[in-house]
């Protein structure tokens, strides 16, 4: 890997790690999702990075994909299990990291440890040439040893410049069909999820997170304002996800346009992902760079 690119990955990782720990300490009863989200996003920018996706907050049975709107009224409550997922980039070189914490309770210690220990096992074993299905097997065994289920349809993912999901998938279960093998210099976000529910996520309500469909041409959009905004979205956010509240801050009256462009397929609106049986879900995530000896954790 080019030294300059390597340094950008390392810096993105250091900033993501600092932002994750900063955000973790903000989560307390009666604090709003929006307040934590905006403070963490500001922290990332103040430390010199940009966001590779909106800060995600997923509580209890929600596994992933929620970022508050500007008018969001949700607050953390005592007894919540909270996943905080943070993404940064330096010049497009991405870091992705997540942590789970419990709000003024200790009843979730085991499920938090299940995903955390599973991540440790994955990091210890990943190396060039290993089948990612074997990593999934080790993750599944570790989570199962705690009495929980891994989520079988959420995976870790490789990262490339300005691309958050770049091809490789790191499962949390043994997937015999996954014959992929990482190679030296691959950058991968590994993120085991553990649950006391079904071990399978389904789509819920909207997440307020969008992504431009780069294959769609703006000239085919008949509505002039929609066409102009789509071009602006693509220019500003490129191939990375963005929050509805970001669009609202930069583009006046964009709410209706977002819905219209999503309906037409020009934008992807991510759904919230929740356990099929409403089980509690924990997550732990680090970004790693594959090297000849195994990997280096950047976050």
Segments the model singles out, each with a brief description of its role:
Residues 1-299:
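Active-site neighborhoods and metal-handling regions in enzymes and metal-associated proteins
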